[in-house]
Amino acid sequence: MDQSIKFDLDLIHRYNQSGPRYTSYPTALELHEGFSDADYRSHITQSNTLGGPLSLYFHIPFCDTVCFYCACNKIITNNRAHAVPYLENLCKEIAMVGDLFDHSRVVNQLHWGGGTPTFLNHQQMTQLMAVTRKHFQLRDDDQGEYSVEVDPRETHSETIRELRELGFNRISLGLQDFDPAVQKAVNRIQSKQQTFAVLEAARNHGFRSTNVDLIYGLPLQTVATFANTLDQVLEYAPDRFSIFNYAHLPSRFKTQRQIHEADLPPAEVRLDILQMFGNKLTEAGYVYIGMDHFAKPNDELAIAQREGKLYRNFQGYSTHSDCDLVGLGITSIGRVGDAYIQNVKELDQYDALISRGQLPVYKGVDLNEDDKIRREVITQLICHFRLDFPSIEQQFSIQFADYFANELVNLGGMQNDGLLDLSDNSIQVHVAGRLLIRNICMVFDKYLTQKQQQFSKVI
């Protein structure tokens, strides 16, 4: 499979609109409060009859400083004692949820996200992993995908060693930009020494994969400053890059109101940055996975994509399509069977529900048959840039051309523009269409029209 990209400025201008990132379909906006504790328990019971491995996501919400660009669910505090009651309740939730799942179901994927997971000290991290191991079947052979997000500003070599000993084998670190003016504008002061020390320690302690997060479109960024940041990181050759377009949505995220809109780079500069990093990463030997993600050709994501086994969920791209995803901690989102479930967002609600022995469910949604069909279509397109109609027809007992008659008509314009090739049996996304894969997927999203302004721009 060709894993390259092509930068076509005219096409990008024409199709640059707001749209979902499709870590799920339906998107999280379709979750509703009518989904209950009992509904979640019922889906777990049904899931156990099918069996299969699990993926666990733990949300550690604490950060000791606020990054103005951040759209994550977080709690800002420099008082480390605030983590103590949260960790106690998280362990109770792990016990409640873990005991509902068949203990023979192996955890093939595990992720600590946030917030800042390294807000916890070593004793707390050890406790969290021990409780998890007690109530879920964790792997002991180091063959699972156990990943953790770290903040280089507060992560030292000893912390990296401790995380590796706890069983983590993949690490992701936020960087965003090295330029001092940009860092000051977003309130994230992070030195090169701190960043590269974490990358070096991760390799020295045997982490199998390192990922670096960068954001373009931040205030005061230029092509030159971002290129300088990227060149320095490339010297350390991380296994993966996640390079996101900053979505400025101050009406939804209060911390973004600290950013001066006049300092944000115009669309033309963003596009120049996009073209620059695409060229640099390709020249450095990385392949384009999709949706702002690049990886080395021998990385598991790149291999899975070439073999047609790549998947996408709330954690991003994954090689574990067969796992039920269990969300733990406030705001976490999971997928069990054909349902999406989100936990409550406020600590007091979380505490109250856990103390009553209830699962801390806030919202959820049961997928109907149409949702399942469209989810599979979007997943295939966003992961493999190709969709074979016969596979969908066989899986769901439909006639693709009849079921998606309107959508196929709407794809005609994209075919004329050179984004894709549409035949009687398939959709093949062209190299020029890969950066615009969200637009192609949006054609199949029946919920989109009234929700479009709540999403970021596709470029």
PLM region spans:
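A short, conserved structural fragment
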Residues: Q415-N425
